[in-house]
Amino acid sequence: GEWNVGQLVRQRFGDEALLVGFTTFNGTVTAASSWGGPAERKRVRNALPNSVEDLFHETGLRRFLLLMPETSRAKTALQKPLLERAIGVIYRPETERQSHYFLTRLSDQFDAVIHVDETRAVEPLERTSEWTAGEVFETFPEGV
């Protein structure tokens, strides 16, 4: 199976970890079309109906932080399974539903969520995706 960084951190540190998710309804993103491909500025499609991102968009707020402590109404409300979009270093809008959406109970996945309704792509500091010689930085999970 696949594990995300949040699952690994929660497994290692339990309730000492605070997991924060990020969502967006639309905008632009810097991502590649395939592993090892060059970074591109891509338009992010509007979120699918009945997704977490669509629900947050319907609030009419441009951006917000949603805290979900154990006894909060938000945590209870977000127990319902919803589609959630994951955009990382790869973004494939042409297969977005299959490539980037999954079913989740958001309040089981995160302790808080930052929603930015419309994002703007970041510009890469280094405009190449080629490997460079040298030792790879440790990133699992202690090196994060």
Spans of model-derived segments:
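C-terminal regions of proteins
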Residues: 1-144
